[in-house]
């Protein structure tokens, strides 16, 4: 828990938004590749 407290409050929402965004983008590109093929 000390590790979570040492991070700034911005770190959690940043990861919460960036990680899903990257996952959605990679999934979108994967589906687009399959459509082209």
Curated annotation (Swiss-Prot):
Residue spans crossing the bilayer: 10-30
Q: State where the protein is found.
A: Plastid, Chloroplast thylakoid membrane
Cellular component per GO, a single term = chloroplast thylakoid membrane
Q: Which GO terms describe its biological process?
A: photosynthesis
- Per the annotation, which location comes first and is thus the protein's main one? plastid
Quote the PANTHER family the UniProt record gives. PHOTOSYSTEM I REACTION CENTER SUBUNIT VIII, PTHR35775
UniProt similarity note: Belongs to the PsaI family.
Name recorded for this polypeptide: Photosystem I reaction center subunit VIII
What organism, scientifically named, is this protein from?
Citrus sinensis
């Amino acid at each position: 828990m000390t590790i979570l407290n040492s991070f700034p409050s911005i770190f959690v929402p940043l990861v919460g938004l960036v990680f899903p965004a990257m996952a959605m983008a990679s999934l979108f590109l994967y589906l687009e590749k399959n459509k082209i093929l």
